[in-house]
Structures are given as C-alpha cells and as structure tokens.
Amino acid sequence: MAYRVQWLTPLAAVLSSILTISASPPAAARDIVAFRDGSYSAGTIVIRTNERRLYYVMGDGRAVRYPVGVGKAGKAWNGRVQIEGKYIRPAWSPPADVKRDKPQLPNLIAGGSPRNPMGAAAMTLSGGGQYAIHGTNVPGTVGGFVSYGCFRMYNQDVLDLYSRVSVGTAVVVTR
C-alpha cells in the first residue's frame, strides 16, 4: 500500500501541473494591435462577434485586443450600448432563458464562488440589463460562440479592461 501512495503522490503532482497549465489562458491573451478604423473615438469598446474579439480603442491608431466568448447561435446581437455598471466579483442570478435551459441552477450564486460564471468582474450594458462583459469560471469557453448574449473574457483580461473604462463608456457590437 505504501508503494501505491508513493506512486500516486508524484502522479497527482504531475496531473495537477498539467491541469493548471491547460486551464490557464494563453500568455498572449491580450495584445496591442493596429486599429485604423476612424469611426471610433479613443475609449470606445468595439466587439466584433464574428472575430470573437473585443477592442478597446486607445486612439493613435492602436487598440488593446482581447479574445472573448460571444453569443451562440440565436443569441448573438449587435448595436450600440454603454457600460451601465461596474462590479468586482458580482453575485449572479441566472436570467429566465438560462434557468429554463438549466433548471438545476440555484436562483443566486454568490460573488467569488467558483461556480459563478461572472468571474472576477462584470460590466453591465445598457438596454435592459440582461447583457454584460464579464470574466468566466470556465476559461476554455473564451473565444467560442458559447453565451446567451454576454461577452466572456479571461479574468485577468476583464480586470484589465475594467481598469480602463468607466460607467458611460460607449460599446459598439458588430458582426
């Protein structure tokens, strides 16, 4: 039995390191890129859902580009909205359509809980309060067509964006 424990302990360490590496986002989760579309002023957030990218326009022909998870088939949308609220480790109540699809979810998941899909921070969007730009508890979904209309970011990326924007920041969602 002692032999088995000695063997399992190193195995557990190896598996733990593999799982930690695979659960971590890529090192270049965000980058600064050329952004020459003069339609948007500095400080604007532009989300291009077909690219699954969010751009924070810096001006001077550059933007910070972040990967995002976007609305799945039938849930994608486009339009102009604003950041309506900013929250660190927010609690989450599943909207009616999520609750319908996943009735086992509790009515409220506390902020900071590993089960909370909002992740490290959320910025709610105007237009009814049903959509947000937020972190995630499942980093592997960033970059996919996966949400009910919200925009999922790696937690370190949503915190970076959070620090750059304020309530009232313009958000333009395009396909």
Please give the residue ranges for each predicted region:
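Bacterial N-terminal signal peptides that target proteins for export
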Residues: 1-12
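C-terminal segment of classical bacterial N-terminal signal peptides
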Residues: 17-26
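Exported/periplasmic cell-wall-interacting domains
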Residues: 31, 37-40, 60, 65, ...
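Residue-level detector of beta-strand structural context in well-folded domains
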Residues: 43-45, 52, 121
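Structural recognition of beta-strand segments within beta-rich domains
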Residues: 46-48, 55-56, 152
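Beta-strand-connecting loop/turn residues
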Residues: 50-52, 129
